[in-house]
Curated annotation (Swiss-Prot):
Intracellular or extracellular location(s): Secreted, Extracellular space, Extracellular matrix; Secreted
SMART domains, alphabetized: WNT1
Keyword flag Cell inner membrane: no
Sequence similarity: Belongs to the Wnt family.
Segments forming a coiled coil: none
Cellular-component GO terms for this entry: extracellular space
Name the UniProt record assigns to this protein: Protein Wnt-7b
Entry keyword Glycoprotein: yes
InterPro entries referenced in this protein's UniProt entry, alphabetically: Wnt, Wnt7, Wnt_C
Region called Disordered linker, residue ranges: 33-61
Any Gene Ontology biological process: cell fate commitment
Amino acid sequence: SGSCTTKTCWTTLPKFREIGYILKEKYNAAVQVEVVRASRLRQPTFLKIKQIKSYQKPMETDLVYIEKSPNYCEEDASTGSVGTQGRLCNRTSPNADGCDMMCCGRGYNTHQYTKVWQCNCKF
């Protein structure tokens, strides 16, 4: 009869925030590994879990690390990290922008400001 059907398929990426959340969860659950050199010729080098809590082999999608992360709270000139000291934080937030987390237990100072400006109001 001359009719034609077109089928179009596409894949979309999840929202950036969702990806960030998943990566943060994986980062928090990452396990430390150490490189084990082969003792004999033709034997491959492999990674071994450094601390055995309840041994569970990491899956291909899990994160592992060889060296511990630096202390992001403190300034580190070698990496260019400025740390968190002196940054503004949200006193009521339980997230990364919150003072409890961002200030790394050092405590924080609160300041109250009054802002005055012309509003061009007409009465």
